[in-house]
Curated annotation (Swiss-Prot):
Plays an essential role in the assembly of succinate dehydrogenase (SDH), an enzyme complex (also referred to as respiratory complex II) that is a component of both the tricarboxylic acid (TCA) cycle and the mitochondrial electron transport chain, and which couples the oxidation of succinate to fumarate with the reduction of ubiquinone (coenzyme Q) to ubiquinol. Required for flavinylation (covalent attachment of FAD) of the flavoprotein subunit of the SDH catalytic dimer. This is Succinate dehydrogenase assembly factor 2, mitochondrial. The keyword Magnesium does not apply. GO terms for biological process: mitochondrial electron transport, succinate to ubiquinone; mitochondrial respiratory chain complex II assembly; protein-FAD linkage; tricarboxylic acid cycle. GO terms for cellular component: mitochondrial matrix; mitochondrion. The keyword Lyase does not apply. This protein may be expected to contain an N-terminal transit peptide but none has been predicted. It is found in: Mitochondrion matrix. Pfam families: Sdh5. Interacts with the flavoprotein subunit within the SDH catalytic dimer. Belongs to the SDHAF2 family. Keywords: Chaperone, Mitochondrion.
Length: 137
């Protein structure tokens, strides 16, 4: 009780102004655009996707389940792992190939997320039965 009254007195006496700090990224220009990357910064090389033609179906399912869970961003980890849990076990070999291309061809995970939630239009090459299933979730 004594401690509570002391704390109440301190809180009532100390009226600090509320300050909001706005943090800007170092890559942002004053007009809101992004500064061009300096010449000494090199984008990492991403090896091209190679389709695994003779992979057994059960091995492919296990690999796709793992890849669905271990993405580069939390949103896709949640979205794709939930999708895989619901649909992966019943997919046909053609659907497995479509899903494999969908999660491994685009180099940007945000593209997959934006297509699946309808923020951006899906490119024709990824507008498949599997993408329809993903959008229906």
């Amino acid at each position: 009780m004594y401690l509570r009254s002391i704390m109440r007195g301190v809180i009532e006496r100390v009226q600090l102004p509320f300050v909001i700090h706005i943090r800007k990224l170092s890559s942002e220009m004053p007009d809101g655009g992004l500064y061009p990357a300096p010449d000494h910064i090199v984008e990492p090389w991403i090896p091209p996707y190679e389709e695994r033609k003779n992979e057994p179906v059960e091995i492919k399912r296990a690999r796709l389940l793992y890849q669905s869970r271990k993405r580069g961003m939390l949103e896709n980890c949640l979205l794709l792992s939930t999708f895989a849990k619901k649909f992966l076990h019943s997919m046909t070999p053609l659907q497995l190939d479509q899903y494999d291309r969908l999660i491994n061809l685009p180099s940007n995970d945000w593209d997959i997320y934006n297509w699946s939630v309808g923020v951006k239009p899906t490119p024709e090459e990824f507008e498949t039965e599997v993408m329809d299933m993903l959008k229906s979730m």
